């Protein structure tokens, strides 16, 4: 009976799949000055993450910084970039000055 209860707890409290709406766009916009700035910054970071995986595959480890948040195997680089922004792993203010 204990195994059944443990299984039910895992099913009931299982984390839902995250998608493009998680993190919520409103919280992302509060970290950025504008929609345009958020889109540009997230796209640049997604390209860096893609390049990191390419470099990793080719054996070069130090050219780009990899993901700063936990990543699932099926996560897209843009989703990872958005999560990094939502969790304050990146400084959007300094990038606006560049």
Curated annotation (Swiss-Prot):
Keywords: DNA-directed RNA polymerase, Nucleotidyltransferase, Transcription, Transferase. SMART domains: RNA_pol_Rpb6. One of its GO terms (cellular component) is DNA-directed RNA polymerase complex. Its EC number is 2.7.7.6. Promotes RNA polymerase assembly. Latches the N- and C-terminal regions of the beta' subunit thereby facilitating its interaction with the beta and alpha subunits. NCBIfam families: rpoZ. Belongs to the RNA polymerase subunit omega family. This is DNA-directed RNA polymerase subunit omega. It comes from Tropheryma whipplei (strain Twist) (Whipple's bacillus). The gene is rpoZ.
């Amino acid at each position: 009976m204990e195994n059944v209860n443990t299984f039910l707890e895992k099913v009931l409290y299982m984390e839902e799949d995250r998608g493009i709406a998680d993190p919520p766009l409103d919280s992302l916009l509060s970290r950025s000055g504008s929609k345009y700035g958020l889109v540009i910054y997230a796209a640049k970071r997604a390209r860096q993450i893609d390049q990191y995986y390419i470099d990793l595959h080719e054996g070069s480890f130090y050219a780009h910084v990899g993901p700063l948040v936990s990543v699932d195997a099926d996560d897209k680089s843009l989703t990872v970039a958005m999560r990094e922004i939502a969790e304050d792993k990146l400084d959007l203010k300094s990038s606006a000055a560049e």
